């Protein structure tokens, strides 16, 4: 078992990581090979379009590293499905978009590996709650 020097969490555009900040300074302070990481990350996420991909990079004492990519943030998936640039500044007053229950279920299925929900329905409720807090209304929810 290698000794862990640090754990870095970043959110980077898929296939477009560069050695510029935030990647360079975050990995540089642990002495990890920045170019090696950006090449590996870009190769692994090239098929994800323009999504923002959260990544957890574990850097070891011998300066080697491993990384795990996660699913895109829920707010990103909701904005994309509703065709929005950003959520509502006042979600309780101004509604900025609509999603139907099928879209909510689709987002829930995408996020399932990263959620601690026991079922797709439970995950869908989590998605619906996030959407509501962004000022997006949900149509056709089974128990809303």
Curated annotation (Swiss-Prot):
It holds the Pfam family Ribosomal_L11_N. PROSITE patterns: RIBOSOMAL_L11 (PS00359). GO terms for molecular function: large ribosomal subunit rRNA binding; structural constituent of ribosome. One of its GO terms (cellular component) is cytosolic large ribosomal subunit. One of its GO terms (biological process) is translation. Keywords: Methylation, Ribonucleoprotein, Ribosomal protein, RNA-binding, rRNA-binding. One or more lysine residues are methylated. Forms part of the ribosomal stalk which helps the ribosome interact with GTP-bound translation factors. HAMAP family: Ribosomal_uL11. Belongs to the universal ribosomal protein uL11 family. Part of the ribosomal stalk of the 50S ribosomal subunit. Interacts with L10 and the large rRNA to form the base of the stalk. L10 forms an elongated spine to which L12 dimers bind in a sequential fashion forming a multimeric L10(L12)X complex. This is Large ribosomal subunit protein uL11. It comes from Deinococcus geothermalis (strain DSM 11300 / CIP 105573 / AG-3a). The gene is rplK.
């Amino acid at each position: 078992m290698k000794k862990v020097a640090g754990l870095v969490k970043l959110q980077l555009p898929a296939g477009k990581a560069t050695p510029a900040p935030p990647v360079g300074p975050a990995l540089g302070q642990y002495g990890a090979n920045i170019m090696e990481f950006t090449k590996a990350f870009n190769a692994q996420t090239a098929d994800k379009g323009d999504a923002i991909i959260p990544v957890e990079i574990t850097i070891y004492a011998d300066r080697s590293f491993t990384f795990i990519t996660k699913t895109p943030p829920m707010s990103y998936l909701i904005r994309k499905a509703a065709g929005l640039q950003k959520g509502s500044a006042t979600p309780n007053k101004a509604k900025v978009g609509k999603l139907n229950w099928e879209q909510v279920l689709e987002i829930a299925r995408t996020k399932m590996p990263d959620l601690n929900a026991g079922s797709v329905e439970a995950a869908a409720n989590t998605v619906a709650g996030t959407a509501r807090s962004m000022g997006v209304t949900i149509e056709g929810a089974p128990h809303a």
